[in-house]
């Protein structure tokens, strides 16, 4: 029989792998954005996005841009596809992180 603790750790590993995929897709999106729309790239702090001196308020602009699906009116098809992929991965990763938290609470109650 599979233990609940091992299932919890497997869920954590899946969540971490999906986070890595999300950040990789976000980095690829920023590369495409730099080429197709330099003004938007500067607007969302594309150059400093993954650095310690990045500006979180500018980074949140990209998050809200993707969340509100404002990219649908963009002229570049590859950029639209990348935004869709990042949005789906963000929703999946958020759901998995929520499931990890719920699982952790359940493990604390039952053990």
Curated annotation (Swiss-Prot):
Pfam families: UspB (PF10625)
Magnesium among keywords: no
Residue intervals passing through the bilayer: 1-21, 90-110
Topological category with respect to the lipid bilayer: Multi-pass membrane protein
Keywords, alphabetical: Cell inner membrane, Cell membrane, Membrane, Transmembrane, Transmembrane helix
Example of a GO cellular component annotation carried by this entry: plasma membrane
Subcellular location: Cell inner membrane
Family: Belongs to the universal stress protein B family.
NCBIfam families listed in its UniProt record: PRK04960.1
Protein's recorded name: Universal stress protein B
The encoding gene: uspB
